[in-house]
Amino acid sequence: MRGKFITFEGIDGAGKSTHIGAVAARLRERKDIPAVVTTREPGGTPLGEDLRQILLHRKMHLETEALLMFAARREHIAEVIEPALARGDWVISDRFTDATFAYQGGGRGLATSRLETLETWVQDGLQPDLTLLFDVPLETASERLAGAREPDKFEAESRAFFERTRAEYLRRAAQAPERFRVIDATQSIEAIRVELEKIISTL
C-alpha cells in the first residue's frame, strides 16, 4: 500500500517546525506504518541542501529563484519522496509546493500560471494527502523571529511581503479544503499538539 504524504506550511515565525518531530513520533507508534520519513524544502537531498543555501542567502531574479526551487523539488521527489511513498512509508515535509506559490507567487508576484506549469512538469500529479497550514498574524510571527539567529533572505523581507504571502496561503487553503487543515498557531504548543493528534488520527 502506498504511503501518505503530509506537508507543513506557514510563513516564517508561524511555529510549524516545532511540531514536526512530535507528529512524526506519534505516527511511528502506529503499527500500520512501516516507517516515517521527515524532510524539508528546499533541501532533503545533498543537491537540494546545496541549492537551499543559494536560495536562502543569494540575491537573484525572481524567476531564477522559482526555477531553483522546482529544481530542488524535482530531485527531492525523485530521490526521497516517491521512493518512500512507493515503499509504503509516510513522508512529512517541512514545506512543499504551496510555499512556492505563497512566497514566489504571493510574496514576489510571479505569475501563478508560470508556477503551475512548473508544478505540472516537476510533480507529474504528485500532491500531498494532507497539508497543515500554521497561520498566525504577522505581529506574532515577527515577535517569534525577533532576537533569533541572523535572518535569511526570506525572513528579512518586508511586512508587505509577508502579508501577501500569508494571504496566498489562506487563498490556497480555501480553494482546497479537502487537503488543507488551517491551524490557529497562536494557541499554546499543547493545544496545537492535541489538535494535530486529532487530525492525524483520521488518516
From Swiss-Prot:
Transmembrane segments: none annotated. The keyword Zinc does not apply. ATP binds at G10, I11, D12, G13, A14, G15, K16, S17. This is Thymidylate kinase. It comes from Cupriavidus pinatubonensis (strain JMP 134 / LMG 1197) (Cupriavidus necator (strain JMP 134)). Its EC number is 2.7.4.9. One of its GO terms (molecular function) is ATP binding. One of its GO terms (cellular component) is cytosol. Keywords: ATP-binding, Kinase, Nucleotide biosynthesis, Nucleotide-binding, Transferase. Phosphorylation of dTMP to form dTDP in both de novo and salvage pathways of dTTP synthesis. One of its GO terms (biological process) is dTTP biosynthetic process. It is an enzyme of class 2 (transferase). Pfam families: Thymidylate_kin. The gene is tmk. It catalyses: dTMP + ATP = dTDP + ADP. NCBIfam families: DTMP_kinase. Belongs to the thymidylate kinase family.
